[in-house]
Amino acid sequence: MRFDVVTIFPEYLSVLDVSLLGRARREGLVDVHVHDLRDFTVDRHRTVDDTPYGGGAGMVMKPEPWALALEHVAAQGPAAPAPADPASAEPGDRPVLLVPTPSGERFTQRFARELAGREHVAIACGRYEGIDERVFGWAEELFEVRLVSLGDYVLNGGEVAALAMIEAVGRLVPGVVGNPASLVEESHEDGLLEYPVYTKPADWRGRAVPPVLLSGDHGKVAAWRRTQQEERTRERRPDLWAAFDSED
C-alpha cells in the first residue's frame, strides 16, 4: 500500500520511521512518500500562500503549487489512470486524496478499514486558513477526493491528522500488526469501545483482577467482556451507543 503526503513541513512526518509503521516501511508492507509543497512552486521565494479574496484574517494556500504537486503524486501511484469522465469512475479506479480539515466528514475506524483496501492514498496537508477551494473540484479529475476531520477541534495544519490516519490505516494492512486477532477485539471494530484489560499481578495495591478473568471459563470471560463493552460505551460514548442500539 502506498501513501503520498504533501506538506510544507516534510520533517513533521519523520516519526513514521519508528515503531510498527517504521518496520512495515522497511519490510515493504507500507510505502510512504513525503513531498515538500514548496518544491512545486515556480517563483524564487517558493510562495505557497496569498491573501484571501473577500478579506479576512490569515492566508490561503495557492492553487498552482497544489495542482503541480498532486499531478506529480497521481503519476507516481500504482492505481489505474483516471477515466476521461471522472463522474463515471467506479470506486477504486482512482487513488484517494484525503484532505484533513475541521469541516470534513468524521474519520472513523470504518473509514480506516475502507482505505486499507485501497492501493494508493494521498494526503494534502493544508496550513493557514486552508487550501483554495477550487483545488478540490479540480483534483476530482485525478483522485477520489475526501475531506476528513479527526474531531470537532482545530489543529494548526494537516500533518497531525495525516500521521493519525496513516497509522490507523497502515496497521490494518496484513502483516503490519503481529497478531491479527488483536485488530478484531479493539474499540470501534464492532461499534463498541474495547473492554478493560489486566495483566499480572492478580492483586496490585489492594486492587484485584475481576475473578471471572481468572476462572478459565472462556464462555464466562467472553460474556463479561461483552457486558463491559456495552457498559463502557453507554457511559463514555452515548453517541456510539445510540447508533449501536438502533442496529441491534
Curated annotation (Swiss-Prot):
Q: Which BP terms in the Gene Ontology apply to this protein?
A: tRNA N1-guanine methylation
Region described as Disordered: 224-248
- What is catalysed by this protein? guanosine(37) in tRNA + S-adenosyl-L-methionine = N(1)-methylguanosine(37) in tRNA + S-adenosyl-L-homocysteine + H(+)
Q: Which UniProt keywords apply?
A: Cytoplasm, Methyltransferase, S-adenosyl-L-methionine, Transferase, tRNA processing
Major subcellular site: cytoplasm
Q: Which InterPro entries match?
A: Alpha/beta_knot_MTases, tRNA_m1G_MeTrfase_C_sf, tRNA_m1G_MeTrfase_TrmD, tRNA_m1G_MTases_N, tRNA_MeTrfase_TRMD/TRM10
Q: Tell whether Transferase is among the UniProt keywords.
A: yes
Coiled-coil zones: none
Protein location? Cytoplasm
Q: What is its EC number?
A: 2.1.1.228
GO CC annotation, single: cytosol
Give the compositionally biased regions (Basic and acidic residues). 227-239
Please list the residues that bind S-adenosyl-L-methionine.
126, 150-155
Q: Name one GO molecular function term.
A: tRNA (guanine(37)-N1)-methyltransferase activity
Q: Which SUPFAM superfamilies match?
A: alpha/beta knot
Q: How does it assemble?
A: Homodimer.
The family line of this record is:
Belongs to the RNA methyltransferase TrmD family.
User: Per its database record, what is this protein's job?
Assistant: Specifically methylates guanosine-37 in various tRNAs.
**HAMAP family the UniProt entry points to:** TrmD
Q: What is this protein called?
A: tRNA (guanine-N(1)-)-methyltransferase
- Natural source organism: Micrococcus luteus (strain ATCC 4698 / DSM 20030 / JCM 1464 / CCM 169 / CCUG 5858 / IAM 1056 / NBRC 3333 / NCIMB 9278 / NCTC 2665 / VKM Ac-2230)
